[in-house]
């Protein structure tokens, strides 16, 4: 596998080596050695999620408070999604910046979203199936949303068939980025680096 850090520090695109023959294909989705090579620590999986979305469904933006937040190792096993990570860590040199990765069932890429970042994705095809390994179990008291179409963030979501994205009631009612910031819920850069540094033993 090859890992490339995105424009948001702490987020990586992972591209596997795919072996194809007459039977089909095989690839290693995750190895401890490969993960440690870019993240500097092992991935302690506490929950595994699967979502199936129709074309045009937008899920996010979601983040969890530190500690322990919730890192995610995300891939699309069927269909395709436009996957987005946003730097919401106050004090970060890239605060407010976003980056994206196309996850699909052709290149089989994965995105790793470390603790303290916001995440969301837009399904580009019907029955787009996303699997994600999570470093912590879901905790509704510490899980929060940010408006995915907030003009302050200006995420360039692609239109699917020219239609506005379909959101859950919760995501549609998500507060703006500035409102979440004013509420004091956003993580701080130093806090996240200290938390991750402890996992790395540094």
Swiss-Prot record:
Where along the chain is substrate bound? 23, 28, 47-49, 59, 72, 119, 143, 170
Pathway, according to UniProt? Carbohydrate biosynthesis; dTDP-L-rhamnose biosynthesis
As recorded in UniProt, its EC number(s) are: 5.1.3.13
Superkingdom of this protein's organism = Bacteria
Q: Where is the active site?
A: 62, 132
Ordered alphabetically, the record's keywords are: Carbohydrate metabolism, Isomerase
Q: Does the keyword Isomerase apply?
A: yes
Which reaction equation describes what this protein catalyses? dTDP-4-dehydro-6-deoxy-alpha-D-glucose = dTDP-4-dehydro-beta-L-rhamnose
UniProt keyword rRNA-binding present: no
Gene Ontology cellular-component terms for this entry are: cytosol
* UniProt record, GO biological process: dTDP-rhamnose biosynthetic process; polysaccharide biosynthetic process
The molecular function terms of the Gene Ontology recorded here are:
dTDP-4-dehydrorhamnose 3,5-epimerase activity
User: Where is the site described as Participates in a stacking interaction with the thymidine ring of dTDP-4-oxo-6-deoxyglucose found in this chain?
Assistant: 138
The record's annotation in InterPro entries points to: RmlC-like (IPR000888), RmlC-like_jellyroll (IPR014710), RmlC_Cupin_sf (IPR011051)
**Comment field (misc):** Was identified as a high-confidence drug target.
Q: Which family does it belong to?
A: Belongs to the dTDP-4-dehydrorhamnose 3,5-epimerase family.
> Subunit notes for this chain?
Homodimer.
The cross-references to PANTHER family, in alphabetical order and at most eight, read:
DTDP-6-DEOXY-D-GLUCOSE-3,5 EPIMERASE (PTHR21047), THYMIDINE DIPHOSPHO-4-KETO-RHAMNOSE 3,5-EPIMERASE (PTHR21047:SF2)
> What role is this protein assigned?
Catalyzes the epimerization of the C3' and C5'positions of dTDP-6-deoxy-D-xylo-4-hexulose, forming dTDP-6-deoxy-L-lyxo-4-hexulose. Involved in the biosynthesis of the dTDP-L-rhamnose which is a component of the critical linker, D-N-acetylglucosamine-L-rhamnose disaccharide, which connects the galactan region of arabinogalactan to peptidoglycan via a phosphodiester linkage.
Descriptive protein name: dTDP-4-dehydrorhamnose 3,5-epimerase
Organism classification: Bacteria, Bacillati, Actinomycetota, Actinomycetes, Mycobacteriales
Q: What gene name is given for the protein in this entry? A: rmlC
């Amino acid at each position: 596998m090859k890992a490339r850090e995105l424009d948001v520090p702490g987020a990586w695109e992972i591209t596997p080596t795919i072996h194809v023959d007459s039977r089909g294909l095989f690839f290693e989705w995750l190895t401890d050695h490969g993960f440690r090579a870019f993240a500097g620590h092992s991935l302690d999986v506490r929950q595994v999620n699967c979502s199936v979305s129709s074309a045009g469904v937008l899920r996010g933006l979601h983040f969890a408070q530190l500690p322990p937040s919730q890192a995610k190792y995300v891939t699309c096993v069927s269909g395709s999604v436009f996957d987005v990570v946003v730097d919401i860590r106050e004090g970060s040199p890239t605060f407010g910046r976003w980056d994206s990765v196309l996850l699909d069932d052709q290149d089989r890429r994965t995105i790793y979203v470390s603790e303290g970042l916001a995440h969301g994705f837009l399904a580009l095809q019907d029955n787009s199936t996303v699997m994600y390994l999570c470093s912590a179990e879901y905790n509704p008291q510490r899980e929060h949303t940010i408006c995915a179409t907030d003009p302050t963030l200006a995420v360039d979501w692609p239109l699917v068939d020219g239609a506005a994205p379909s959101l859950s009631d919760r995501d549609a009612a998500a507060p703006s980025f500035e409102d979440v910031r004013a509420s004091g819920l956003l993580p701080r850069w130093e806090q996240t680096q200290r938390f991750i540094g402890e996992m790395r033993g540094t």
